[in-house]
Each structure stands twice: as structure tokens, then as C-alpha cells.
Amino acid sequence: MLVLSRKSNESIQIGDNIEISIISIDGDQVKLGINAPRHIDIHRKEVYLAIQQENSEAAKTVPLSQLKGLLNQQG
């Protein structure tokens, strides 16, 4: 892992099109600004992990008999 030190109002450039700026530092809270192309998803780590978990749950296979039971309940 690359570790860089930055002060308020300084930036880090990633590749040609991603810039991370230090907006402010207040105690143990750091506010970041991120400029990146719209096609790049940017999430807090805990949100990203929750999305991955939900996607994993949604991708699980369900036995056909269970699906038929659900359809019968609907109709």
C-alpha cells in the first residue's frame, strides 16, 4: 500500500483523470473531494461492502420447487 501525506487544500492524482483533494481536516475527520469520470463508481468502504453482500445474496440460486411455491402463493 502506498501511503502519502497531504495537508488541507492539497491533492493526489491517480492516473490521468482521478484527483483526490483534501478539503478539510477537523480533529480525526478528514473531508475528501474526488474528481473522477462518471463511469467510475465511488463509495465509502462500508457502503461498497454492503452492495457486494446484497449482490451476492441476489445471485444465489433458489430451488425450482421454492420458486413454484412462491408463484402459487401469488396466484
Swiss-Prot record:
GO BP terms in the entry: bacterial-type flagellum organization; mRNA catabolic process; negative regulation of translational initiation; regulation of bacterial-type flagellum assembly; regulation of carbohydrate metabolic process
Domain of life: Bacteria
Cellular-component GO terms for this entry: cytosol
InterPro entries: CsrA, CsrA_sf
Major location category of this protein: cytoplasm
Role, per record: A translational regulator that binds mRNA to regulate translation initiation and/or mRNA stability. Usually binds in the 5'-UTR at or near the Shine-Dalgarno sequence preventing ribosome-binding, thus repressing translation. Its main target seems to be the major flagellin gene, while its function is anatagonized by FliW.
Family that this chain belongs to: Belongs to the CsrA/RsmA family.
Name of the protein this chain belongs to: Translational regulator CsrA
Organism field: Halalkalibacterium halodurans (strain ATCC BAA-125 / DSM 18197 / FERM 7344 / JCM 9153 / C-125) (Bacillus halodurans)
Lineage of the species this protein comes from: Bacteria, Bacillati, Bacillota, Bacilli, Bacillales
